[in-house]
Amino acid sequence: MAVQALPEINKLSVSEEGAANAAAKGQAAQGTAGNDDAENDESDEDKEDEQEVADGAAAAGGKKKKKKTKKKKKKGTAKVQSDPPRVPLSTLFPNNNYPEGEIVEYKDDNAYRTTNEEKRYLDRMNNDFLTDYRKSAEIHRQVRQYAQKELLKPGRSLTEIAEGIEDSVRALTGHMGLEEGDSLVAGMGFPTGLNINHCAAHYSPNAGNKMVLQYGDVMKVDFGVHVNGRIVDSAFTVAFDPVYDNLLNAVKDATNTGIREAGIDVRMSDIGAAIQETMESYEVEINGTIYPVKAIRNLNGHTIGHYLIHGGSTGKSVPIVKGGDQTKMEEGETYAIETFGSTGKGFVRDDMEVSHYAKVPDAPNVPLRLSSAKNLLNVITKNFGTLPFCRRYLDRLGQEKYLLGLNNLVSSGLVDAYPPLVDVKGSYTAQFEHTILLRPNVKEVITRGDDY
Protein backbone atom coordinates (compact mmCIF):
# COMPACT_ATOMS: atom_id res chain seq x y z
CA MET A 1 0.00 0.00 0.00
CA ALA A 2 1.48 3.29 -1.10
CA VAL A 3 2.74 5.97 1.25
CA GLN A 4 2.90 9.51 -0.10
CA ALA A 5 5.91 11.62 0.70
CA LEU A 6 5.33 14.39 3.20
CA PRO A 7 4.03 17.07 3.24
CA GLU A 8 1.50 16.07 0.60
CA ILE A 9 -0.14 13.49 2.86
CA ASN A 10 0.54 12.08 6.29
CA LYS A 11 1.75 8.54 6.63
CA LEU A 12 -0.99 5.96 7.04
CA SER A 13 -0.12 4.37 10.37
CA VAL A 14 -1.84 1.89 12.62
CA SER A 15 -1.43 1.37 16.35
CA GLU A 16 -0.07 -1.77 17.82
CA GLU A 17 -1.82 -1.03 21.10
CA GLY A 18 -5.28 -0.71 19.62
CA ALA A 19 -5.06 -3.78 17.42
CA ALA A 20 -3.37 -6.11 19.84
CA ASN A 21 -6.48 -6.49 21.77
CA ALA A 22 -8.27 -7.76 19.28
CA ALA A 23 6.33 -26.17 -3.97
CA ALA A 24 7.89 -23.57 -4.25
CA LYS A 25 6.43 -20.22 -3.34
CA GLY A 26 2.87 -19.79 -4.51
CA GLN A 27 2.75 -23.42 -5.64
CA ALA A 28 3.62 -25.24 -2.44
CA ALA A 29 0.03 -25.96 -1.54
CA GLN A 30 -1.01 -26.98 -5.04
CA GLY A 31 -0.77 -30.68 -4.35
CA THR A 32 2.43 -31.33 -2.42
CA ALA A 33 1.52 -30.93 1.24
CA GLY A 34 1.05 -34.24 2.96
CA ASN A 35 2.62 -36.51 0.31
CA ASP A 36 5.76 -37.40 2.24
CA ASP A 37 3.87 -38.72 5.25
CA ALA A 38 1.61 -40.84 3.06
CA GLU A 39 4.49 -42.38 1.11
CA ASN A 40 6.41 -43.18 4.28
CA ASP A 41 3.35 -44.90 5.77
CA GLU A 42 2.95 -47.10 2.70
CA SER A 43 6.63 -48.02 2.59
CA ASP A 44 6.64 -49.07 6.25
CA GLU A 45 3.53 -51.22 5.81
CA ASP A 46 5.00 -53.04 2.78
CA LYS A 47 8.15 -53.83 4.75
CA GLU A 48 6.05 -55.29 7.58
CA ASP A 49 4.25 -57.64 5.14
CA GLU A 50 7.54 -58.87 3.67
CA GLN A 51 8.94 -59.55 7.13
CA GLU A 52 5.86 -61.55 8.16
CA VAL A 53 6.22 -63.83 5.10
CA ALA A 54 9.90 -64.41 5.77
CA ASP A 55 9.35 -65.19 9.44
CA GLY A 56 6.58 -67.67 8.64
CA ALA A 57 8.70 -69.55 6.14
CA ALA A 58 11.61 -69.79 8.53
CA ALA A 59 9.43 -71.17 11.27
CA ALA A 60 8.11 -73.92 9.01
CA GLY A 61 11.64 -74.91 8.07
CA GLY A 62 10.78 -74.86 4.42
CA LYS A 63 11.47 -72.72 1.45
CA LYS A 64 10.33 -69.20 1.48
CA LYS A 65 7.10 -68.85 -0.38
CA LYS A 66 6.45 -65.66 -2.19
CA LYS A 67 3.31 -64.08 -0.98
CA LYS A 68 1.68 -61.46 -3.08
CA THR A 69 1.33 -58.48 -0.81
CA LYS A 70 -1.66 -56.27 -1.11
CA LYS A 71 -0.89 -52.72 -1.96
CA LYS A 72 -1.81 -50.60 0.96
CA LYS A 73 -3.92 -47.55 0.43
CA LYS A 74 -2.21 -44.34 1.28
CA LYS A 75 -3.35 -42.97 4.58
CA GLY A 76 -2.67 -39.42 3.41
CA THR A 77 -3.77 -37.77 0.22
CA ALA A 78 -2.39 -34.80 -1.59
CA LYS A 79 -4.01 -31.64 -0.35
CA VAL A 80 -4.78 -29.09 -3.02
CA GLN A 81 -6.23 -25.62 -3.09
CA SER A 82 -9.71 -25.17 -4.51
CA ASP A 83 -10.75 -22.83 -7.30
CA PRO A 84 -11.75 -20.26 -6.14
CA PRO A 85 -9.44 -20.53 -3.10
CA ARG A 86 -11.50 -21.62 -0.10
CA VAL A 87 -9.36 -24.23 1.69
CA PRO A 88 -7.79 -22.67 4.82
CA LEU A 89 -4.01 -22.63 4.60
CA SER A 90 -3.77 -24.42 7.95
CA THR A 91 -5.40 -27.43 6.26
CA LEU A 92 -2.83 -27.46 3.47
CA PHE A 93 0.06 -27.00 5.91
CA PRO A 94 -1.06 -28.82 9.09
CA ASN A 95 2.39 -28.53 10.66
CA ASN A 96 2.54 -24.76 10.06
CA ASN A 97 5.67 -25.15 7.96
CA TYR A 98 4.97 -22.52 5.34
CA PRO A 99 7.28 -21.80 2.40
CA GLU A 100 10.00 -19.30 3.12
CA GLY A 101 10.53 -16.34 0.85
CA GLU A 102 13.52 -15.69 -1.37
CA ILE A 103 16.63 -15.79 0.80
CA VAL A 104 19.26 -13.22 -0.17
CA GLU A 105 22.66 -13.07 1.48
CA TYR A 106 23.93 -9.70 2.62
CA LYS A 107 26.74 -8.19 0.62
CA ASP A 108 29.77 -5.96 1.09
CA ASP A 109 30.37 -5.00 4.74
CA ASN A 110 27.48 -7.18 5.91
CA ALA A 111 28.54 -10.34 4.10
CA TYR A 112 29.86 -11.77 7.38
CA ARG A 113 26.32 -11.96 8.76
CA THR A 114 25.44 -14.98 6.64
CA THR A 115 27.95 -17.26 8.38
CA ASN A 116 28.41 -15.46 11.70
CA GLU A 117 27.30 -17.90 14.41
CA GLU A 118 26.14 -15.15 16.76
CA LYS A 119 23.88 -13.66 14.07
CA ARG A 120 22.54 -17.06 13.13
CA TYR A 121 21.75 -17.78 16.78
CA LEU A 122 20.04 -14.40 17.14
CA ASP A 123 17.97 -15.18 14.06
CA ARG A 124 16.85 -18.51 15.51
CA MET A 125 15.94 -16.93 18.84
CA ASN A 126 13.79 -14.19 17.28
CA ASN A 127 11.98 -15.91 14.44
CA ASP A 128 8.69 -16.87 16.11
CA PHE A 129 6.93 -14.24 14.03
CA LEU A 130 8.25 -15.76 10.78
CA THR A 131 5.49 -18.37 10.73
CA ASP A 132 2.83 -15.64 10.68
CA TYR A 133 4.67 -13.66 8.00
CA ARG A 134 5.18 -16.73 5.82
CA LYS A 135 1.57 -17.79 6.19
CA SER A 136 0.43 -14.30 5.17
CA ALA A 137 2.78 -14.37 2.19
CA GLU A 138 1.65 -17.81 1.02
CA ILE A 139 -1.97 -16.67 1.19
CA HIS A 140 -1.04 -13.62 -0.89
CA ARG A 141 0.66 -15.80 -3.50
CA GLN A 142 -2.23 -18.24 -3.79
CA VAL A 143 -4.87 -15.51 -3.99
CA ARG A 144 -3.02 -13.41 -6.54
CA GLN A 145 -2.38 -16.51 -8.65
CA TYR A 146 -6.13 -17.11 -8.69
CA ALA A 147 -6.82 -13.45 -9.45
CA GLN A 148 -4.36 -13.40 -12.35
CA LYS A 149 -5.92 -16.53 -13.81
CA GLU A 150 -9.64 -15.95 -13.22
CA LEU A 151 -10.48 -12.43 -12.06
CA LEU A 152 -8.25 -9.97 -13.89
CA LYS A 153 -9.89 -10.00 -17.29
CA PRO A 154 -11.42 -7.29 -19.49
CA GLY A 155 -15.13 -6.97 -18.82
CA ARG A 156 -14.91 -7.75 -15.09
CA SER A 157 -16.24 -5.14 -12.70
CA LEU A 158 -13.87 -3.72 -10.11
CA THR A 159 -16.29 -4.72 -7.36
CA GLU A 160 -16.25 -8.33 -8.56
CA ILE A 161 -12.45 -8.34 -8.64
CA ALA A 162 -12.03 -6.73 -5.21
CA GLU A 163 -14.55 -8.99 -3.50
CA GLY A 164 -13.11 -12.06 -5.21
CA ILE A 165 -9.66 -11.25 -3.82
CA GLU A 166 -10.88 -10.33 -0.35
CA ASP A 167 -13.23 -13.30 0.08
CA SER A 168 -10.37 -15.61 -0.90
CA VAL A 169 -7.97 -14.02 1.58
CA ARG A 170 -10.48 -14.35 4.40
CA ALA A 171 -11.25 -17.97 3.54
CA LEU A 172 -7.56 -18.94 3.48
CA THR A 173 -6.90 -17.27 6.82
CA GLY A 174 -9.95 -19.03 8.27
CA HIS A 175 -11.35 -15.73 9.53
CA MET A 176 -14.26 -14.31 7.56
CA GLY A 177 -14.38 -11.14 9.65
CA LEU A 178 -18.11 -11.09 10.32
CA GLU A 179 -17.85 -11.65 14.06
CA GLU A 180 -16.62 -8.88 16.31
CA GLY A 181 -12.83 -8.81 16.45
CA ASP A 182 -12.37 -11.64 13.95
CA SER A 183 -10.66 -9.40 11.38
CA LEU A 184 -8.03 -8.51 13.97
CA VAL A 185 -6.92 -12.14 14.28
CA ALA A 186 -6.24 -12.57 10.57
CA GLY A 187 -7.54 -11.30 7.25
CA MET A 188 -7.06 -8.27 5.04
CA GLY A 189 -4.08 -6.11 5.92
CA PHE A 190 -5.74 -3.21 4.08
CA PRO A 191 -8.40 -2.83 1.37
CA THR A 192 -7.71 -4.07 -2.15
CA GLY A 193 -6.45 -1.22 -4.31
CA LEU A 194 -7.51 -1.41 -7.97
CA ASN A 195 -5.89 1.64 -9.50
CA ILE A 196 -6.45 2.22 -13.20
CA ASN A 197 -4.29 4.20 -15.64
CA HIS A 198 -3.43 7.66 -14.19
CA CYS A 199 -4.62 6.61 -10.71
CA ALA A 200 -1.60 5.26 -8.86
CA ALA A 201 -2.89 4.27 -5.42
CA HIS A 202 -5.68 4.12 -2.81
CA TYR A 203 -8.65 3.44 -5.09
CA SER A 204 -11.09 0.70 -4.10
CA PRO A 205 -14.69 0.49 -5.36
CA ASN A 206 -17.38 1.72 -3.00
CA ALA A 207 -20.91 0.29 -3.03
CA GLY A 208 -22.66 0.91 -6.33
CA ASN A 209 -19.44 1.31 -8.31
CA LYS A 210 -20.04 0.40 -11.98
CA MET A 211 -16.48 0.64 -13.26
CA VAL A 212 -15.37 -2.22 -15.53
CA LEU A 213 -11.83 -3.25 -16.45
CA GLN A 214 -11.08 -2.57 -20.13
CA TYR A 215 -8.57 -4.12 -22.54
CA GLY A 216 -6.61 -0.87 -22.84
CA ASP A 217 -6.32 -0.29 -19.09
CA VAL A 218 -3.21 -0.49 -16.94
CA MET A 219 -4.30 -1.60 -13.46
CA LYS A 220 -2.31 -1.77 -10.26
CA VAL A 221 -3.48 -4.52 -7.89
CA ASP A 222 -2.33 -3.77 -4.34
CA PHE A 223 -3.57 -5.78 -1.35
CA GLY A 224 -2.29 -6.84 2.04
CA VAL A 225 -2.72 -9.94 4.20
CA HIS A 226 -2.12 -10.20 7.92
CA VAL A 227 -1.95 -13.04 10.43
CA ASN A 228 -1.80 -11.93 14.07
CA GLY A 229 -0.86 -8.45 12.91
CA ARG A 230 2.09 -9.55 10.74
CA ILE A 231 1.24 -7.73 7.51
CA VAL A 232 2.60 -8.50 4.07
CA ASP A 233 2.17 -5.76 1.47
CA SER A 234 2.65 -6.69 -2.17
CA ALA A 235 1.43 -5.29 -5.48
CA PHE A 236 1.66 -5.91 -9.21
CA THR A 237 0.41 -4.35 -12.44
CA VAL A 238 -1.64 -5.95 -15.21
CA ALA A 239 -1.96 -4.72 -18.79
CA PHE A 240 -3.49 -6.68 -21.65
CA ASP A 241 -2.10 -4.54 -24.49
CA PRO A 242 1.63 -5.29 -25.02
CA VAL A 243 2.23 -1.63 -25.84
CA TYR A 244 2.59 -1.07 -22.08
CA ASP A 245 5.13 -3.85 -21.54
CA ASN A 246 8.08 -1.48 -21.24
CA LEU A 247 6.30 0.56 -18.58
CA LEU A 248 5.69 -2.57 -16.52
CA ASN A 249 9.23 -3.83 -17.11
CA ALA A 250 10.69 -0.50 -15.97
CA VAL A 251 8.83 -0.56 -12.66
CA LYS A 252 9.41 -4.24 -12.00
CA ASP A 253 13.13 -3.77 -12.68
CA ALA A 254 13.21 -0.73 -10.40
CA THR A 255 11.52 -2.61 -7.56
CA ASN A 256 13.99 -5.47 -7.87
CA THR A 257 16.80 -2.91 -7.83
CA GLY A 258 15.44 -1.50 -4.58
CA ILE A 259 15.21 -4.98 -3.09
CA ARG A 260 18.77 -5.77 -4.17
CA GLU A 261 20.17 -2.54 -2.70
CA ALA A 262 18.21 -2.72 0.57
CA GLY A 263 19.99 -4.05 3.63
CA ILE A 264 21.19 -3.37 7.14
CA ASP A 265 23.00 0.00 7.47
CA VAL A 266 22.13 1.01 3.89
CA ARG A 267 21.14 4.66 3.48
CA MET A 268 17.68 5.44 2.08
CA SER A 269 19.15 8.03 -0.27
CA ASP A 270 21.35 5.41 -1.93
CA ILE A 271 18.39 3.10 -2.50
CA GLY A 272 16.31 5.91 -4.00
CA ALA A 273 19.08 6.93 -6.38
CA ALA A 274 19.53 3.35 -7.61
CA ILE A 275 15.78 2.91 -8.13
CA GLN A 276 15.45 6.14 -10.12
CA GLU A 277 18.45 5.36 -12.31
CA THR A 278 17.01 1.96 -13.20
CA MET A 279 13.44 3.12 -13.84
CA GLU A 280 14.28 6.18 -15.87
CA SER A 281 16.52 4.23 -18.23
CA TYR A 282 13.28 3.00 -19.86
CA GLU A 283 10.87 4.63 -22.28
CA VAL A 284 7.57 3.51 -23.75
CA GLU A 285 5.97 4.22 -27.12
CA ILE A 286 2.19 4.76 -27.10
CA ASN A 287 0.31 5.66 -30.28
CA GLY A 288 3.50 6.77 -31.99
CA THR A 289 4.66 9.01 -29.13
CA ILE A 290 7.66 8.09 -27.01
CA TYR A 291 7.32 8.78 -23.28
CA PRO A 292 10.15 8.56 -20.76
CA VAL A 293 9.21 6.50 -17.72
CA LYS A 294 9.37 8.77 -14.68
CA ALA A 295 9.61 7.68 -11.07
CA ILE A 296 6.69 9.17 -9.10
CA ARG A 297 8.76 11.27 -6.75
CA ASN A 298 6.20 11.78 -3.97
CA LEU A 299 5.40 8.09 -3.46
CA ASN A 300 7.62 5.92 -1.27
CA GLY A 301 8.21 2.50 0.14
CA HIS A 302 7.92 2.20 3.92
CA THR A 303 8.48 0.19 7.08
CA ILE A 304 5.81 -2.21 8.32
CA GLY A 305 5.23 -2.73 12.03
CA HIS A 306 3.13 -5.11 14.09
CA TYR A 307 -0.40 -4.05 13.07
CA LEU A 308 1.27 -0.95 11.59
CA ILE A 309 1.00 -0.81 7.82
CA HIS A 310 3.28 2.21 7.56
CA GLY A 311 5.36 1.79 10.67
CA GLY A 312 3.62 4.29 12.94
CA SER A 313 5.19 7.49 14.24
CA THR A 314 8.66 5.92 14.15
CA GLY A 315 8.23 4.55 10.64
CA LYS A 316 10.71 5.17 7.84
CA SER A 317 10.14 5.90 4.17
CA VAL A 318 12.11 4.46 1.26
CA PRO A 319 12.34 7.06 -1.53
CA ILE A 320 12.30 6.07 -5.20
CA VAL A 321 14.27 9.11 -6.38
CA LYS A 322 17.70 10.48 -5.50
CA GLY A 323 18.24 13.17 -2.91
CA GLY A 324 16.55 11.47 0.04
CA ASP A 325 17.70 11.65 3.64
CA GLN A 326 20.61 9.78 5.17
CA THR A 327 18.50 7.53 7.41
CA LYS A 328 19.73 3.94 7.50
CA MET A 329 17.88 0.64 7.46
CA GLU A 330 18.38 -1.41 10.61
CA GLU A 331 18.49 -5.04 11.64
CA GLY A 332 15.09 -6.55 12.41
CA GLU A 333 13.05 -4.09 10.36
CA THR A 334 10.38 -5.04 7.84
CA TYR A 335 9.99 -3.01 4.66
CA ALA A 336 7.59 -2.71 1.77
CA ILE A 337 9.80 -1.95 -1.20
CA GLU A 338 7.50 -0.44 -3.80
CA THR A 339 8.13 1.69 -6.85
CA PHE A 340 5.81 3.62 -9.14
CA GLY A 341 6.49 4.71 -12.70
CA SER A 342 4.48 7.10 -14.86
CA THR A 343 4.24 8.42 -18.41
CA GLY A 344 2.89 11.67 -16.94
CA LYS A 345 4.46 14.24 -14.62
CA GLY A 346 5.77 11.75 -12.09
CA PHE A 347 3.87 13.49 -9.29
CA VAL A 348 0.53 12.54 -7.71
CA ARG A 349 -2.23 14.52 -6.00
CA ASP A 350 -5.48 13.70 -4.19
CA ASP A 351 -8.56 13.19 -6.36
CA MET A 352 -11.81 11.21 -6.70
CA GLU A 353 -14.09 9.63 -4.10
CA VAL A 354 -12.49 8.38 -0.88
CA SER A 355 -12.66 4.67 -0.08
CA HIS A 356 -9.70 4.10 2.29
CA TYR A 357 -9.82 5.06 5.97
CA ALA A 358 -7.92 4.20 9.14
CA LYS A 359 -8.30 5.02 12.80
CA VAL A 360 -5.67 7.47 14.01
CA PRO A 361 -3.35 5.76 16.51
CA ASP A 362 -3.02 7.34 19.94
CA ALA A 363 -5.56 10.02 19.06
CA PRO A 364 -6.55 12.31 21.95
CA ASN A 365 -9.95 11.98 23.52
CA VAL A 366 -12.34 14.13 21.54
CA PRO A 367 -15.96 14.66 22.63
CA LEU A 368 -18.28 13.47 19.88
CA ARG A 369 -21.67 15.09 19.65
CA LEU A 370 -23.11 12.73 17.06
CA SER A 371 -24.29 9.42 18.51
CA SER A 372 -23.78 7.86 15.07
CA ALA A 373 -20.11 8.86 15.20
CA LYS A 374 -19.69 7.36 18.68
CA ASN A 375 -21.28 4.09 17.62
CA LEU A 376 -19.25 3.92 14.42
CA LEU A 377 -15.98 4.55 16.25
CA ASN A 378 -16.79 1.63 18.54
CA VAL A 379 -17.42 -0.61 15.52
CA ILE A 380 -14.16 0.48 13.88
CA THR A 381 -12.13 -0.06 17.06
CA LYS A 382 -13.51 -3.54 17.74
CA ASN A 383 -13.33 -4.82 14.16
CA PHE A 384 -10.33 -3.10 12.56
CA GLY A 385 -8.37 -1.52 15.38
CA THR A 386 -6.04 0.70 13.42
CA LEU A 387 -5.85 -1.53 10.36
CA PRO A 388 -7.06 0.35 7.27
CA PHE A 389 -10.61 -0.35 6.13
CA CYS A 390 -12.96 0.78 3.38
CA ARG A 391 -16.66 1.52 3.11
CA ARG A 392 -17.42 -1.96 1.75
CA TYR A 393 -16.06 -3.44 4.97
CA LEU A 394 -18.55 -1.40 6.98
CA ASP A 395 -21.30 -2.55 4.62
CA ARG A 396 -20.34 -6.20 5.30
CA LEU A 397 -20.81 -5.61 9.02
CA GLY A 398 -24.34 -4.35 8.45
CA GLN A 399 -23.60 -0.68 9.05
CA GLU A 400 -26.07 1.67 7.38
CA LYS A 401 -26.24 5.43 6.85
CA TYR A 402 -22.81 5.83 8.39
CA LEU A 403 -21.31 8.51 6.11
CA LEU A 404 -22.31 11.43 8.34
CA GLY A 405 -20.74 9.75 11.36
CA LEU A 406 -17.65 8.74 9.38
CA ASN A 407 -17.11 12.27 8.11
CA ASN A 408 -17.50 13.53 11.67
CA LEU A 409 -14.76 11.14 12.84
CA VAL A 410 -12.50 12.41 10.06
CA SER A 411 -13.14 16.07 10.86
CA SER A 412 -12.57 15.34 14.57
CA GLY A 413 -9.13 13.88 13.86
CA LEU A 414 -10.01 10.38 15.06
CA VAL A 415 -10.02 8.74 11.63
CA ASP A 416 -7.83 9.56 8.63
CA ALA A 417 -9.25 9.54 5.11
CA TYR A 418 -6.92 8.51 2.27
CA PRO A 419 -8.20 9.68 -1.12
CA PRO A 420 -6.95 8.16 -4.38
CA LEU A 421 -3.62 9.49 -5.66
CA VAL A 422 -3.49 10.41 -9.34
CA ASP A 423 -1.09 11.76 -11.96
CA VAL A 424 -2.37 13.82 -14.92
CA LYS A 425 -5.30 12.41 -16.88
CA GLY A 426 -4.26 10.51 -19.97
CA SER A 427 -1.09 9.21 -18.36
CA TYR A 428 -0.39 5.62 -17.34
CA THR A 429 1.15 4.47 -14.07
CA ALA A 430 2.53 1.12 -12.91
CA GLN A 431 3.52 -0.36 -9.55
CA PHE A 432 5.36 -3.41 -8.22
CA GLU A 433 5.97 -4.12 -4.54
CA HIS A 434 7.37 -6.76 -2.20
CA THR A 435 7.73 -7.11 1.57
CA ILE A 436 11.24 -7.86 2.82
CA LEU A 437 12.52 -8.87 6.26
CA LEU A 438 15.96 -7.70 7.37
CA ARG A 439 16.79 -10.74 9.48
CA PRO A 440 20.08 -10.74 11.42
CA ASN A 441 21.84 -13.12 9.03
CA VAL A 442 19.92 -12.89 5.72
CA LYS A 443 17.44 -10.74 3.85
CA GLU A 444 14.16 -12.54 3.10
CA VAL A 445 11.91 -11.34 0.27
CA ILE A 446 8.88 -12.80 1.99
CA THR A 447 6.31 -12.24 -0.79
CA ARG A 448 8.45 -13.38 -3.74
CA GLY A 449 6.67 -15.75 -6.11
CA ASP A 450 7.02 -17.28 -9.54
CA ASP A 451 5.00 -14.41 -11.03
CA TYR A 452 7.13 -11.49 -9.85
From Swiss-Prot:
The keyword Lyase does not apply. Binds 2 divalent metal cations per subunit. Has a high-affinity and a low affinity metal-binding site. The true nature of the physiological cofactor is under debate. The enzyme is active with cobalt, zinc, manganese or divalent iron ions. Most likely, methionine aminopeptidases function as mononuclear Fe(2+)-metalloproteases under physiological conditions, and the catalytically relevant metal-binding site has been assigned to the histidine-containing high-affinity site. Its cofactor is Co(2+); Zn(2+); Mn(2+); Fe(2+). Its EC number is 3.4.11.18. Its main location: cytoplasm. Residues 1-96 are annotated as: Disordered. Keywords: Aminopeptidase, Cytoplasm, Hydrolase, Metal-binding, Protease. CDD domains: MetAP2. Residues 18-35 have a biased composition (Low complexity). It comes from the Eukaryota. GO terms for biological process: proteolysis. Gene3D superfamilies: Creatinase/methionine aminopeptidase superfamily, Winged helix-like DNA-binding domain superfamily/Winged helix DNA-binding domain. Residues 62-77 have a biased composition (Basic residues). Signal peptide: none annotated. GO terms for cellular component: cytoplasm. Belongs to the peptidase M24A family. Methionine aminopeptidase eukaryotic type 2 subfamily. PANTHER family: METHIONINE AMINOPEPTIDASE 2. Cotranslationally removes the N-terminal methionine from nascent proteins. The N-terminal methionine is often cleaved when the second residue in the primary sequence is small and uncharged (Met-Ala-, Cys, Gly, Pro, Ser, Thr, or Val). This is Methionine aminopeptidase 2. It comes from Coccidioides posadasii (strain C735) (Valley fever fungus).
